[in-house]
Design a protein with these regions (language model features):
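Internal alpha-helical scaffold of NAD(P)-dependent oxidoreductase catalytic cores
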Residues: 8, 47-53, 115-119, 136-227, ...
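Interdomain hinge/lid region at the active-site interface
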Residues: 223-283
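NAD(P)-dependent dehydrogenase/reductase Rossmann-like domain
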Residues: 274, 282-299
């Protein structure tokens, strides 16, 4: 196989893992003019997803998907990535000069250490997006940021692949990869839990369509926070309304005890950030933090 600099601009692509991410990125690469030659899909759901997003692409065993591709996309769970790479390297499945890309946010290119003798080109391209595994995601990829980590000589090519998929490449240093991923997981994944808990509480209040009440408020809060950071803080904690917060905590003990620890932890973090940013005066902040500490001790 020729080197990346000698190859035609269009690649034969193998997709390992037809989960929500892999199938969508395969479709995005197809739309960009690349040729997906094979996909691995184990579960019935992944085979159906591959058929929907990658019509006509044959489902193959992983070694066959990898060996026939210029560009390999490893879209598999973080915890099995290193093991799979080591196995493919040990069996000689990789080809010299092959582009091998994984989609993990937590890993950079050090996960390819076991394949160093394979002379492959390692790429870590992580889309900062939540996926449904449908064609809706193709539109969401437009202007979606991708965390890019690779060797210096492959950086232009990695960034070009991201742009071809409709994304915006953002360089992430190898030693900052885990910090990058922790930030995204905390901001997006925990947001789902937070909003779901808020919807549950509104249900307790007798509101039939919690999402209708929350959507304008949450959209405004998110937009304000992205523009202003901690200056966007509002509400009883940021105002120092200790009585209101105490009433909330007492209510949660009765109607939603499973939500109470989350409320306490986030209220404490909010109070600390409000203090540091000057939104909350020291005396009010101390009183708020003392209340929260007392309630946590009584959990």
């Amino acid at each position: 196989m020729s080197s990346p600099h000698e190859r035609p601009a269009r690649f034969d692509v193998g997709i390992v893992g037809a989960g929500r991410v892999g199938a969508v990125l395969g479709a995005a690469l197809t739309r960009a003019g690349h040729h997906v030659t094979g996909v691995s899909a184990v579960s019935e759901a992944s085979r159906e997803r591959a058929a929907m997003l990658l019509p006509g692409v044959p489902v193959k065993p992983i070694p066959e998907v990898v060996s026939g591709a210029h560009l390999v996309v490893l879209a598999i769970p973080d915890d099995v990535l290193a093991e799979l790479i080591a196995g493919l390297a040990t069996t000689g499945t990789f080809t010299a000069g092959q582009l091998v890309m994984h989609t993990s946010g937590a890993h950079g290119i050090s996960v390819f250490e076991s394949a160093i003798g394979s002379d492959l080109v390692p790429l870590a391209l992580h889309p900062a997006m939540t996926f449904t595994g449908t064609d809706v995601d193709l539109e969401r990829l437009q202007d979606c940021c991708f965390g890019v980590t690779t060797v210096d000589m492959a950086r232009p090519l990695a960034e070009a692949l991201v742009i071809e998929m409709g994304g915006d490449p953002v360089w992430i240093a190898e030693d900052e990869r885990l910090t990058y991923h922790a930030a995204l997981a905390h901001g997006a994944n925990h947001l789902v839990t937070l909003v779901s808990q808020a919807m549950e509480l509104l249900g307790h209040a007798g509101i039939e369509e919690p999402s209708r009440v929350l959507e304008p408020l949450l959209s405004a809060a998110l937009a304000n926070t992205l523009q202003q950071g901690d200056a966007a803080l509002t509400g009883p904690v940021a105002r120092g309304d200790v009585g209101t917060v105490a009433a909330h905590v007492a209510l949660l003990r009765e109607v939603a005890p499973d939500i109470r620890p989350t409320y306490l932890a986030l209220a404490r973090a909010t109070a600390q950030r409000a203090l540091l940013s000057g939104r909350l005066k020291a005396a009010a902040g101390d009183a708020m933090l003392q209340l929260l500490a007392d309630e946590e001790d009584n959990s």
